[in-house]
């Protein structure tokens, strides 16, 4: 899902941008502290509410709050192009109780001659893994 068009018509809260700019600088692994869990939960729920239909937003929001982050990974890559643009790609991967996977790819472009601006390109994957078959 390319969210550029939708975000053109949406006001992005400044604290949402600050959280993601902060997360670009850190690598988090379990166990998460309480403050990290709240921060991450808050930022992801904001992004989901901006980009997805409200019913799916609510279900993702609840899943995140109840999942207790059984597994979590964060990767960050940074590239510099000849067009004087820095590109940062932030990828989150969650698995909820080993049945559901949620992936967010977040791309921001920081322009040299202006204050850092964020133009996200977002890819969401929200799917349930096959349920284990009962032994017969």
Swiss-Prot record:
Q: What protein does this entry describe?
A: Putative uncharacterized protein encoded by LINC00052
Chief subcellular site? membrane
Enumerate the subcellular locations listed in this protein's record, separating them with semicolons.
Membrane
**Gene Ontology cellular-component terms listed:** membrane
Q: How does it sit in the membrane?
A: Single-pass membrane protein
Q: Which gene holds the coding sequence for this protein?
A: LINC00052
Q: Which residues cross the membrane?
A: 40-62
Could you list this entry's UniProt keywords, alphabetically sorted: Membrane, Transmembrane, Transmembrane helix
């Amino acid at each position: 899902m390319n969210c550029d068009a939708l975000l053109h018509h949406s006001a992005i809260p400044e604290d949402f941008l600050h959280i993601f700019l902060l997360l670009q600088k850190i690598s988090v692994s379990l166990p998460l502290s309480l403050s990290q869990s709240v921060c991450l939960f808050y930022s992801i729920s904001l992004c989901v509410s901006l980009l997805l239909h409200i019913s799916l937003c609510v279900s993702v929001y609840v899943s995140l709050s109840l999942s207790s982050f059984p597994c979590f990974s964060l990767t960050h890559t940074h590239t510099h192009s000849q067009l004087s643009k820095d590109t940062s790609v932030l990828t989150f991967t969650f698995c909820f109780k080993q049945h559901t996977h949620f992936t967010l790819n977040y791309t921001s472009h920081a322009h040299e001659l202006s204050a850092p601006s964020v133009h996200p390109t977002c890819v969401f994957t929200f799917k349930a893994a096959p349920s284990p078959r009962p032994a017969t």
